[in-house]
């Protein structure tokens, strides 16, 4: 910035390089880079803790951190997990979330002998904090997984100032279902399967906007910038494209959410899997090696094989948890119904009122596909619309449509 204004300059970009190491060398070097990234991010003159879900990513961070604490005579590591009131009672397994975290958290906390805290969130409070989460984000983002991370960070901050967590491992090492699909060509962001479904709830005045065409163009613009090597296999090209899209779009959204929800509560969130050296190395690992044994994050699992329990290593990926409690559903339905009854609501300049009423009457079941990611269905879509109305009002947004 100077007297002539602001100038934007890109200071870093991925580079495509030939990967020359065999599987054994790659596994060993990857483990070394992971440990180094975690240990460097443990350096602090204030209390440090880790988030622990019992999944692969947070478990390895917590394992390395606990060993470092022990080696440096810092006592036991504090680890923190999150859950919602009575979630075990109402939990329903699905393709993306085959089991809840509780069993795995206890197993891993015992394995590393951490001082573990399980933070249980009240479902009504979760709904009531949608506004605070929206204000912390400056945007409507990810519904109740915003407010839950906000409340979780608020509780963790009572015990620590820095928290390490496992975000970015899925984007960097191929943890999402779309990484294992066989694409001839990638025409659309792989996490936007519900785009047409979303268009169906738009207000009639904007329903004809070329939203799908715009999204496809943005996707293709990004793909045109993907660093590649000449002569690579189609599979390796697609892996680079998927990784690039995830790093530039999906991961940025998650990092933005993480940074804003934690820092709104004066908690510094650190993400070792986003370490620059680690990302640069992982980007050039061939697809068959990265998805070792045809599994999501196959190589990452193999690099941790001798250090973590096999149960943890082989546990299927489970996303950040959402509440399944009907109390939450009733709370957000009431909040959205209050918006429907408000003659000054701005929401209906964007969203069709009849579709919203139908969503309330069916408790979100009229919207069957994930709004974002893999779990944002039903009550989460309702919560997102509440966030949208909050944002439109709190920031006095004027729509020129």
How should each PLM-predicted stretch be described?
Residues 48-56, 96, 270-271, 320-324:
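Glycine-rich loop motifs involved in handling phospho/adenylate chemistry
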Residues 173-198:
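A mobile, often basic/glycine-rich helix-loop segment
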Residues 28-50, 155-159, 163, 254, ...:
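Phosphate/ATP-binding catalytic cores across multiple sugar-kinase/actin-like superfamilies
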Residues 5-6, 16, 162-164, 191-401:
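Adenosyl-5′-phosphate
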Residues 160-170, 174-176:
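Short acidic/histidine-rich active-site segments
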Residues 50-53, 78-83, 118-120, 164-168, ...:
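Short beta-strand segments
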